[in-house]
UniProtKB/Swiss-Prot annotation:
12-alpha,13-alpha-dihydroxyfumitremorgin C prenyltransferase; part of the gene cluster that mediates the biosynthesis of fumitremorgins, indole alkaloids that carry not only intriguing chemical structures, but also interesting biological and pharmacological activities. The biosynthesis of fumitremorgin-type alkaloids begins by condensation of the two amino acids L-tryptophan and L-proline to brevianamide F, catalyzed by the non-ribosomal peptide synthetase ftmA. Keywords: Prenyltransferase, Transferase, Virulence. The lineage of its organism: Eukaryota, Fungi, Dikarya, Ascomycota, Pezizomycotina. PANTHER family: INDOLE PRENYLTRANSFERASE TDIB-RELATED, PRENYLTRANSFERASE ASQH2-RELATED. This is 12-alpha,13-alpha-dihydroxyfumitremorgin C prenyltransferase. The gene is ftmPT2. It is an enzyme of class 2 (transferase). GO terms for molecular function: prenyltransferase activity. Substrate binds at E94. Dimethylallyl diphosphate binds at R105, K192, Y194, Y268, Q353, Y355, Y419, Y423. Pathway: Mycotoxin biosynthesis. Pfam families: Trp_DMAT. Its EC number is 2.5.1.110. InterPro entries: Aro_prenylTrfase (IPR033964), Aro_prenylTrfase_DMATS (IPR017795), DMATS-type_fun (IPR012148).
């Protein structure tokens, strides 16, 4: 008698296998699972995940993420009780696909009824619970850096009380302080945390840029002084953390939840001036990185992507749009640009990653541009199938008439390879 060492099931049954006897304590959780499960499975298949890895990925979504997604959004019903920083529409869930390494990623903001009801006004409880459970599931997840930045970038109980008393009523957007992301790779998971110090800034009077840089400095990592210096110089960051150019705004810190010696730090900004010259300055650190051949190679590919997308240049006045769920962005809406730089004690210059946000652009045009870029990169299989893949994720819409499916595209270049991720609307 042969005993099988692993369970396999037909691909089409991976979702049904977990769904058949699943139980959820609320209708919201059931609806989140029924919507996100098939969506994730399609993306996993297209990213060529082995069949044996698909069920564990779905199981993690069902058991750990879905319970923390809060109220399921419904068009025409009351606005979501919590406006998340994760997506343009405040929905706390986003799928993306790293096309070079075929890695699927879920970005999300863990929520609970405490945050949605206002009891946990700055949503500190659910992210803490969720990340602790993640760490219990995989021993490669290390929370040392997470705890450090929690301490320095989240509002204290005293600051919460002051904000609720002195700054009321607070805007519905921007109250969230931390979000998470999980990536499925090599049969396991990796996790990242993101800290938004906007509320800490409001409570302390210190700029987000200063709060982030001070928290990094307190790590006392040898070798970080030089890359931080180059970042400060490029962005014109003054001692108070404010850039000399008011169109640029530091707003976010990203950190890998792994052992501290391997954990990367990412410093994020938005830029209200969207132009190729700004992109090139951010990529080259105003020319400082041009001595590195990889900088020029990456810049040339980034220019091709920029030209293909044909993003209109200009100043963006609307940093935080207040769109009603289920309503497409106005045809003339154009988002800001984003960038981050990875700070490492092992590298003289921080590595850039550019985010070209495409919300508001016609999806058919965006898909044509991406397909053309895949051909430039030699990704011929993806180029020939990409439109069909996206149509399977979002059945029904006419992409010549939609402008919200593709949230954005990020580009970086490391080890002589382009790293391209595409971000999709959750609905």
């Amino acid at each position: 008698m042969t005993i099988p060492t692993e369970i396999s099931c037909p691909e089409e049954d991976a979702f049904q296998l977990l769904d058949k006897f699943s139980w959820f304590p609320s209708d919201d959780q059931r609806r989140w699972w029924e919507y996100t499960g098939p969506y994730l499975l399609k993306l996993l298949r297209d990213a060529k995940y082995p069949q044996k890895d698909q069920v564990p990925c779905l199981y993690l979504l069902q058991q750990l993420l879905v319970p923390y997604l809060g109220t399921f959004p419904v068009v025409g019903q009351a606005p979501l009780p919590w406006w998340s920083n994760v997506t343009t529409y405040g929905v706390p869930f986003e799928l993306s696909w790293n096309l070079l390494h075929n890695i699927v990623r879920i970005g999300f903001e863990p929520l609970s009824h405490l945050a949605e009801s206002g009891v946990d006004a700055f949503n500190k409880t659910a992210p803490e619970e969720c990340v602790s459970r993640l760490a219990c599931l995989d021993n490669t997840i290390d929370l040392a850096r997470f705890r450090h930045f929690q301490h320095h970038l989240l509002v204290t109980p005293e600051e919460e009380t002051w904000l609720l008393k002195e700054k009321a009523p607070l805007a519905k957007s921007g109250r969230g302080q931390q979000t998470l992301a999980v990536e499925f790779q090599n049969g396991g998971i990796s996790a990242k945390a993101y800290f938004f110090p906007g509320m800490k800034s409001l409570a302390t009077g210190l700029s987000p840029g200063k709060l982030i840089l001070d928290s990094i400095e307190r790590l006392a990592l040898p070798g970080l002084k030089e890359p931080v210096h180059h970042l400060r110089s490029t962005l014109g960051l003054q001692d108070d953390g404010h850039p000399t150019d008011t169109a640029i705004a530091p707003f976010l810190l990203g950190v890998d939840l792994c052992t501290p010696e391997r954990s990367r730090l990412k410093f994020y900004v938005t830029d209200q001036v969207v132009s190729w010259d700004r992109v090139a300055d951010m990529w080259t650190l105003r020319g400082k990185r041009l001595e590195d051949p990889q900088c020029a190679d990456g810049l040339a590919l980034l220019r091709k992507l920029w030209d293909l997308l044909a993003i209109p240049e200009g100043y963006r006045s609307n940093i935080r749009p207040d769109f009603a769920f289920g309503t497409p962005p106005p045809e003339d809406y154009r988002p800001v640009m984003m960038a981050n730089w990875t700070l490492s004690p092992k590298k003289k210059f921080p590595d850039p990653q550019i985010y070209l946000l495409t919300v508001g652009m016609n999806d058919a045009v965006v898909m044509d541009a991406l397909v053309a870029f895949y051909e430039v990169l030699g990704w011929t299989d993806l180029a020939s199938t990409y439109k069909d893949k996206v149509a399977s994720y979002f059945p029904g819409p006419d992409f010549t008439k939609t402008n919200y499916i593709h949230s954005g595209v990020s580009f970086s270049y490391r080890h002589s390879k382009p790293y391209l991720s595409v971000y999709y609307s959750p609905f």
